[in-house]
Amino acid sequence: SSSSAASDVYKRQLNGMTMPRRFGGLNFPITPYTMCAEIVAAADAGFGNIWALQDCIETLYEFGNEDQHSRFIPRICAGETMSMDLTEPDAGSDLQSVMLKATFDEKENCWRLNGVKRFITNGDADLHLVLARSEEGTRDGRGLSMFIYDKREGGVDVRRIENKLGIHGSPTCELVYKNAKAELCGDRKLGLIKYVMALMNGARLGIAAQSVGLSQAAYNEGLAYAKDRKQFNKAIIEFPAVYD
């Protein structure tokens, strides 16, 4: 199960693989991390989603400040989970249309997020990178910023978990932000045009690794069956149509 897989991975300290050792990471380059993502996905693609989303921390490490590094990166290295909250009911591939609202709370010296995110992989994660509209009156990508939401702060409800065909070990959620406390990651207005672009490049690599791992696992299953299944007094792998 995904829970037992998570327990095994945490015991072996395979989180924060690419993060510096001073934060509790392993300081690996991206290549061995991607190889591990492929292996994990071959064993359990659902857990692979949960585990591989640790690469969201790359974006926080690259664009966050030192205070955010010291507070958040050790938590991911210790096994806490992450998600990237981008998609909305009216903003799928067209992320310029994101309307989840971010307003600055001067009294509390923090940002507040209000709105809905949909189809969020690992939506019950501990730390979320959230794309939100911080510039009032804007309608395009230049009005979007990236925020860090910590589950410990509260203010976000999981309204729905999607009933998917597979990958059940990783919940895909609809999230409702209700005045949720958050903090800015990097600079305002660069959420989509800079930070999400970097975030998605890492995610695409992770999905590719997951796909290769799943394909290899499916091939191994098919090969084992073809060697075991017998028809006309021989294993079906000996028939050219199957062997090819």
Where are these regions (language model features)?
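A short core secondary-structure module
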Residues: 110, 114-156
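Single conserved hydrophobic/aromatic residue that forms the stacking wall/gate
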Residues: 1-6, 10
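Internal maturation/activation junctions in enzymes
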Residues: 7, 52-53, 64-100, 109
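Internal helix-loop-helix
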Residues: 11-78, 120-123
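Glycine- and acidic
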Residues: 15-22, 37-43, 52-58, 66, ...
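Short Gly/Pro-enriched turn/cap motifs at secondary-structure boundaries
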Residues: 90-93, 119-122, 138, 164-171
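A glycine-rich, basic-preceded beta-loop-alpha segment at the flavin cofactor/substrate interface
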Residues: 152-155, 159, 171-203, 220-238
